[in-house]
Regions:
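Amphipathic, Lys/Arg- and hydrophobic-enriched alpha-helical face
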Residues: 28-46, 63
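Arg/Lys-rich amphipathic alpha helix in sigma70-family domain 2
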Residues: 65-68, 79-94
Length: 94
C-alpha cells in the first residue's frame, strides 16, 4: 500500500492510538504483507497464518498505546506476530 503524500507511518500510528478505525485499516493494509510473511514462517498453512496475522493485528490495536514511538514500529509488530504465532501453536498442541 502506498501512503498518500503527507501521511507518514507515525501519523497513522498516532491516529490509531486515538481509536481511528480508518487509520487502523490503513495500518493493517500497510503492514499486511509483512505480517503474513512472518506468520507463514511460524504457521502450518496459509489459513493458520491468516488467523495469526488477524489475531496479531487485534492485539496491536488493543495495545497500541504501549508502543514506544522511539523504537521502530516494524520491530514491535514483528514481536507481537511471533508471540501470537507461538501462543496459537501452544494452544493447538493441547
Amino acid at each position: 500500500m502506498h501512503l498518500r503524500p503527507g501521511v507518514a507511518e507515525e501519523e497513522i500510528i498516532h491516529h490509531c492510538k486515538t481509536g481511528s478505525l480508518k487509520h487502523q485499516e490503513m495500518l493493517y493494509k500497510l503492514f499486511y504483507g509483512y505480517a503474513m510473511g512472518i506468520s507463514l514462517r511460524y504457521s502450518l498453512n496459509r489459513d493458520d497464518a491468516l488467523e495469526v496475522t488477524n489475531d496479531a493485528f487485534i492485539k496491536v490495536f488493543k495495545s497500541i498505546n504501549s508502543y514506544n514511538n522511539t523504537k521502530p514500529f516494524k520491530a514491535w509488530l514483528r514481536t507481537v506476530i511471533i508471540n501470537t504465532a507461538i501462543d496459537r501453536r501452544r494452544k493447538d498442541l493441547k
